[in-house]
Amino acid sequence: MLPFTLAGALLTSLIAVANEPPITDLAFTPEAKHVVAVSQSGIHLYAWPELDHKRTIRTSTSNLHSIAFSPNGKYLAVGGGAPSEDGVVEVFSWPKGEPITRFDSHNDSVRSVIWQDNDRLLTASIDREIKLWHLEKETNSILTLKGHSRSVDAICLIGNGQTLVSTGADHSLRVWDMESGTLIRTMNQHTKPVNALELRPVRDGLPMVASAARDRTIRFWQPTIGRMVRYIRLDSEPLNIAWTNDGDRVLATCVDGRVRIIDPVEVTVTQDLPAIKGWAYALAMHPHNRSAAIGGINGQIWRIENLSEPGARSEPR
């Protein structure tokens, strides 16, 4: 297996970068030729892999935290809101970027947005609730899940979208039946708040989910049977995680700005690469190859690639 190598770019000049808000989430566009970044400064589109700024999409939502494209690539959802005031999700048409609808029934910032299908999406909020929405029903959510005692910060769907896994500041992972809205089980092995949750993309056997927490561990789970399979403790807190497309490795971006490449079977760090100068909040894997976008403090975005030359060095573009 070829090692990962790093190349990158700053979104602003070196003089202005200290004034830029952190990149909080990243997503590749459906055609995978661009990457979308969100932050307190809004929604920005960058060419991939050059990372040249191409476009800004206007939004009325403050403090954006999460971004997701619908499975058919026709819609873009972004979530955020003012802390302790409201949680908002805006849906835009894609690629035009025109506003389609807006959901604002959460009482605190939205931390995570995912799509169940092309018409329904799920949101997780600091208000401790998870809501299911339909694009044609703008006023109220069609399902609300309650059970977390603190902020819900990450969610993912397994089992053809019929089962939801959620996690957050109460240290727990919770498994929900989406048809009935009932809680199936709770898993409590993390000892500090959980930052991220990601489903392994390869479907061989039981679904596997990875979680990253402030206890500096990345844990691997089989939620359908309530089993924690294994874990690894890092020397820096992981802020975000992503599986490679083949499910063979997990990338973790950390508070020290480095990227750890983890073997989920041997639970070892196979590579440890420098990336962001500061906290690396955002991470997105390219859908067609072994490259990724990494975003973090002061508006930085870098790219990580699986190049044929192991000795290639990382340099800002």
Kindly give the residue locations of the regions a language model identified:
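A structural motif specific to WD40 beta-propellers
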Residues: D52-R55, E98-T101, N140-L143, T182-R185, ...
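Hydrophobic beta-strand positions that form the internal "hydrophobic ladder"
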Residues: V35, L76, L121-L122, L164, ...
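Short loop/turn segments that connect beta-strands within beta-propeller blades
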Residues: W48-L51, W94-G97, L135-E138, M178-G181, ...
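WD40/WD-repeat beta-propeller blade N-cap
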Residues: A16-I23, R58-L64, F103-V110, L145-V152, ...
